[in-house]
Amino acid sequence: MKTLFVIKLVVLISALLWKSCAGNLYCDIYEDELPSSCKDILAKYPGTPSGNYDIQPVSYGPTITVYCDMENKRCGSKGWTAIARVDMSLPGSQCPGNLHLITDSESGIRSCGADPNSIGCAFAEFLTHGIEYTEVCGMLRGYQVGSPDAFGPYVNDQGNPESFVDGVIISHGTTPDFIWIYANGAEKVPSSSSNIVCPCTGPLYNGVVPPYVGTDYYCDSGVVSDPQGGVFYPTPLWTGTGCNPPDFCCSASGLPWFSKKLPLPTTDYITLEVCHNELPENTPLDQIQLYIR
């Protein structure tokens, strides 16, 4: 009788283990521990397709389900763990963090931006769940409202760390350490010398890119010339199209994707801020994708 009980118990445990592992491409890892990231999964199982997987970023910590992009050639490598995948065109989509929902009445485009009634930045923090990473990759799609000033605020408001660009700031940690900037200039073709257009629009640009930004930025405008206050321009920004030579920061290779290698490994959360220093201007986003590796 005792032997029969043991056999039944073994069968029951086996059935439960099989049920928990059904459809899991790395079930045998359960005998030891779950992988800590999508990169870890790919290292153990080359050829694993993109999809949702369970990982355990911290040993003996909680298990979380993440989306793994295993074939993202736009980031220059594989095995990326998604920390943000926002598409406001999908039904039921909501703006992350304290980004404000902005709906254009004419185009119907739903997007997430800064507070339309207050200057400054609105932000969203994306957790990395303890995953150690040295690379960040992602893409944004945004739109121009009114006449944003690109890096004009840095020239006009130096000394204010929260007011150096109209557009989007991606950073990590509390310092913060900047990862990438998506700047939004007033117009593609300025008619006179200006510091509120993109730095690479040509000899008429007389502004300054903050030294701590370096070359880790894109810049674009949603209107050719003469932007009007408060108008939502439905032409997507940072697509690499409609640029005018020598507008290299508008037509840079890889747009709208960026990829950045960090100097040191970190587990910091990543912050995305949409900023504007005047009303009525904004740079709302309808697509946000951020990955770490």
Report the location of each language-model feature.
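Mature extracellular or lumenal effector domains of secreted proteins
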Residues: 2-293
